[in-house]
Structure formats: C-alpha cells, structure tokens
Swiss-Prot record:
<protein>
    <recommendedName>
        <fullName>UPF0200 protein SSO1041</fullName>
    </recommendedName>
</protein>
<dbReference type="GO" id="GO:0005524">
    <property type="term" value="F:ATP binding"/>
</dbReference>
<keyword id="KW-0547">Nucleotide-binding</keyword>
<dbReference type="InterPro" id="IPR027417">
    <property type="entry name" value="P-loop_NTPase"/>
</dbReference>
<keyword id="KW-0067">ATP-binding</keyword>
<dbReference type="InterPro" id="IPR022970">
    <property type="entry name" value="NTP_hydrolase-rel"/>
</dbReference>
<comment type="similarity">
    <text>Belongs to the UPF0200 family.</text>
</comment>
<dbReference type="Pfam" id="PF13238">
    <property type="entry name" value="AAA_18"/>
</dbReference>
<feature type="binding site">
    <location>
        <begin position="15"/>
        <end position="22"/>
    </location>
    <ligand>
        <name>ATP</name>
    </ligand>
</feature>
C-alpha cells in the first residue's frame, strides 16, 4: 500500500545522538520541506501508552516487539497524511527495517542522509544542550550510543546515500548540508 504518489523526494536522516540531525532537519524546513521528527511521533504515543517509569527508548523497543520493526516508520507516514511538499524529511531513522518500510510506503525516491560527528564532539554537544533525554554523564552517553547501535543505526549509516560530516563550525556544516540537499533535489 502506498500513501503517496511519489513525485516528491524523501530524505531519511540518520546519525548518532548529538551528530547534528536536528540541525540538518531545521535547514531543510527553512527550504520548505515537510519535516517529521520520528522521536516526536513516538513521544506522542508514549504520552498515552507508556508504562509507569518506562523510558522512551524502552517504549519504542516494546512498540517494535508488538507491531514489528517498521512500526515507527508506519506511524510517521500516517502522521504525514497527504502532503503537497516537494521534499519530505523524516528525522531520526534507526534501522534498516524502517528504511524498507519507508520505501514500501513512499516509493523509490527515498534517500538516506547520515550526519556523522566524532564521539567527543557529540558528547560535548549533548552535555551542553538542555534536552531532557540527554545525560550529563559520559558513561550514560556511551550506553545510549550502544543502545542505538543495537537497534541497527550503524547499518543505516553504512547504507547512506550521502554522509554529511559535522566536525567543524556551524557555517561549514550548513554549507555541507546545502550541498547534499542540492544534490538530492537535482539528481537524487
């Protein structure tokens, strides 16, 4: 079943926590893309269905166990509804099962863009930002990385059509993002 007749381009953003995925998504939104943050879609369900004391990541794992590994992708496509955007972005792809589900539902104009940043830079960013799901302890950040890798995020990064390295200043990162976006929109 396809939800859209795809004359649009779809970008699936992946990357480890703190790599710059959300910043890339913001830049795409500024260019007119429809952006759906996958963790926000999970959080919406979490607020209704989570067990007392259950962590968001554990809730997402439980959803996958019950409904299959592509469930978050399906929920995100449902969230998309009918879109009149030329570019649709899903921020936070974590497994190849999700990639396959997006391709099954949205067609072949789906491109994986990985945002990569070295661990020391990512950890520094996460300690400095004020997100509720970020720990301030390096050991917890390393544990979170391992959990993400167990979900299959490393395989998605390895299969990326494009990789943006985020190891410099914001202006350089923005330039790299624009370059990749232009390539996707022009050539696919």
């Amino acid at each position: 079943m396809s939800y859209l007749v795809v004359t649009i381009k779809v970008i699936l953003i992946t990357g480890m926590p703190g790599s710059g995925k959300s910043e890339f998504a913001k830049l795409l939104k500024e260019r007119g893309a429809k952006v759906i943050v996958m963790s926000d879609v999970v959080r919406k369900r979490y607020s209704i269905e989570a067990k007392p004391g259950e962590r968001l990541m554990d809730f997402a794992k439980r959803l996958r166990e019950i409904y299959g590994d592509g469930v978050v992708a399906r929920l995100c496509v449902e969230e998309l509804g009918t879109s009149n955007h030329d570019l649709v972005v899903f921020d936070g792809v974590r497994s190849l099962a999700e990639v396959e589900e997006f391709k099954r539902l949205l067609g072949d104009s789906v491109y994986i863009v990985a945002v990569h940043s070295p661990p020391k830079i990512r950890y520094k960013r996460m300690i400095e930002r004020l997100r509720s799901d970020d720990s301030k302890e390096i050991s917890e950040l390393i544990r979170r990385d391992r959990e993400e890798l167990k979900l299959g995020i490393g395989e998605v990064i390895a299969m990326a059509d494009y990789i943006i390295t985020n190891d410099s200043n914001y202006e350089e990162f923005k330039r790299r993002c624009e370059e990749v976006t232009d390539r996707v929109l022009k050539n696919g």
